[in-house]
Regions:
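Feature marks short, highly hydrophobic, charge-poor N-terminal signal-anchor/signal peptide-like helices
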Residues: 1-11
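Solvent-exposed, non-transmembrane helices and loops of integral membrane proteins
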Residues: 42-60
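Cleavable Sec-type N-terminal signal peptides
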Residues: 10-18, 185
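Transmembrane-cytosolic junction motif
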Residues: 17-41
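Charged, low-complexity intrinsically disordered regions
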Residues: 35, 53, 60-65, 69-217
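Polar low-complexity intrinsically disordered regions
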Residues: 1, 17-21, 38, 121-122, ...
Length: 217
């Protein structure tokens, strides 16, 4: 019996070591890809930033909190600040986030969620209400949620529908918040996809100029 337990213990230990080695290799490859992408875009790379994500409240941040930005790339393509990072919440990486600063700031937030993301409510829209968001309606293959129905309707037109349709199902949510356009992307996406979603974000940010800007006294 004791011999069997020893064998089982050894097997478990070996399996744990293998998992750790594979995870380390994955992280190393991920870090290398992120550094190379930063280099190609004349951007900066940082291993982590625990402060950056505190400015956002919607998208994946509405469920798991601010979390931490890992494997962060920051730059200014076309003069606008861009961030690319892996979002860690509760000790696990839940998505890759791209954030592009918009030329204007608005108090109106617009989220475009996949049907599966919209269905995470309890059927009565509880999850949307908790974040102060109301269902605006379908926009192409996604569902739009907002904190200001009247203002958000200004930004919904055929151009937005076309942008939604080319976004891809690996983007769980596309949203405008404050002075940012953001996308939550599947963590398995690579450099080519990061480029594609960056271009989609630029288009989305331009369309969100229709949201009413914050007016300072």
């Amino acid at each position: 019996m004791s011999t069997t337990l020893i064998v089982v213990g050894v097997i478990v230990l070996v399996a744990a070591v293998v998992v750790l080695v594979l995870d380390a290799r994955h992280r190393s490859a991920r870090s290398r890809a992120r550094r190379e992408w930063a280099g190609r875009h004349s951007a900066r790379y940082a291993v982590a930033d625990p402060v950056l994500t505190g400015q956002w409240r919607h998208g994946p941040f509405s469920r798991g909190g601010a979390g931490t930005a890992l494997e962060l790339v920051s730059g200014e393509p076309d003069g606008n600040t861009l961030y690319l990072f892996d979002l860690e919440q509760g000790g696990a990486v839940v998505s890759t986030v791209l954030a592009l600063r918009r030329p204007t700031t608005s108090d109106t937030t617009v989220e475009l969620r996949l049907g599966s993301e919209a269905a995470t409510t309890d059927g009565d829209g509880a999850a949307a209400s908790e974040a102060g968001m109301d269902l605006l309606g379908p926009v192409g293959s996604r569902y739009a949620f907002t904190n200001d129905l009247e203002s958000a309707r200004r930004a919904v037109d055929q151009r937005l529908v076309l942008t939604v349709e080319v976004t891809g199902e690996d983007v769980s949510v596309l949203w405008a918040e404050g002075s940012w356009a953001l996308a939550a992307l599947d963590i398995t996406a690579g450099p080519q996809r990061w480029d594609e979603v960056t271009a989609i974000l630029a288009r989305f940010a331009e369309l969100m100029r229709l949201l009413p800007p914050v007016r300072h006294p």
